[in-house]
Curated annotation (Swiss-Prot):
GO terms for cellular component: cytoplasm. It comes from Bacillus anthracis. Keywords: Aminopeptidase, Cytoplasm, Hydrolase, Manganese, Metal-binding, Protease. It comes from the Bacteria. This is Probable cytosol aminopeptidase. NCBIfam families: PRK00913.1-2, PRK00913.1-4, PRK00913.3-5.
Amino acid sequence: MFQVQKELASHEAVVVALFEEEKTSSFVQELDKAFEGQLQVLLEEKELSTKKKAISKVHSLGKTDVKRYYFVGLGKKESYTTETLRSALGKTFKTLQAAKVQDAAILLDSFVTEKLDAIDVAHIAAEVQGLGTYELQTYKSDKKDRVELEKFTAITAEDAQEIEAALTVGYVHGRATNSARTLVNMPPNVLTATKLAEYAVELAEKYDMDYKVLEKEEMEELGMGALLAVNQGSVEPPKMIALIYKGKEEWTDVIGFVGKGITYDTGGYSLKPREGMVGMKGDMGGAAAVLGAMEIIGELRPEQNVIAVIPSTDNVVSGTAFKPDDVITSMSGKTIEVLNTDAEGRLALADGITYAKKLGANYLIDVATLTGGVIVALGNHTTGAMTNNEELFEQVLEASMETDESIWQLPIFDRDKERVRNSKFADLNNSPGREGHAVMAGTFIGEFAEDTPWVHLDIAGTSESSGAHDLGPAGATGAMVRTLATLVERFGEE
């Protein structure tokens, strides 16, 4: 699909950047000659806009070998960022998709500035080509034909091998993010814990990773009472899924991802209202993020050891379901008083984190659609983060800045720990109250990370989008897939 060339050839469409300061770039000047001065007229009349994310289409009318030019406005160079570029190109690829373009090229060097080099631009272009044109996988009987972009050429004077590598990495990041989106969008009667485990096993086998899938009996032997409690009401068996990627000769410096895999959440006996229950098929967004990251890792083979652990079940009501006031014993040996059965994700993660440590994780990053409180605090575009290790958090933060997946650190104070440890009957309680809800949930999980360096990522607000946007349709976003993978890639470079 991807090609790199130094000279522009015949294409259906060519994408060109327009900055405010460069309305007459060398390429535009040369092209203007072919257009007999008409491009300059369009610029002066503002028919070609330099405003951020403005897309202006110009038909060559046979004056060049290119059928149409798509000029992408990027605003002022001083405010040009990777986020601007991602949004602008995402919108551009959506436009090309709508026009059913099959052969497109991008004038890569026109997007290059002192801030962003050609490798950056190539990576982002290939990444958002997949993200921006992603379509929901539906179950409708009337399937519409989709015209795909079959050939995408980067025109640049830079080293072709380096640009090809950047295009490949970007493409893999975008594709794996879309894989996670598809998982999150799947209905709960299709994506059960068993089906999620089967998907994980297929992924592991494809990329020659080791894996384990613990069944209920094995969990009972290991004392995974927290995950098993959540599963009590279900007819679907629980799964504790582990993927093991060995990027080094020795099993050291192991990064452990733990993704919440609640395939449907009714709230249990702490029952959600109807409007709060619809959409809870997406409560396994953390698991999807972890699996998406492992897809990237499997493709790119970084020199880093990684474990991905997914505790998976649904949380439903029945005569056997766990109840408020129950006291359960986690794999760690810590006992938990259940005050809220709708705070089930942290229970599953408690055993997931303990299991990841048992498998050898030296660093822990958990990802979960955990609390509505984080949405109240940070909105729908920023992931909440908590940590017991600032050095690890800084590495996660740097990765998130590189991928434009915003995160913001929330605090853990001793008084927060006291609140989750406040129980007359057990070591911990799973829900101290609504105040500081996101912080309480993260603090609870931290009790199981203990002294292992740990970062918690609450993606309840960022895992799904209520409306279409430049990087995709409404629905699942694949939040944190690219950040997790980038973190591992950077670890591997050290």
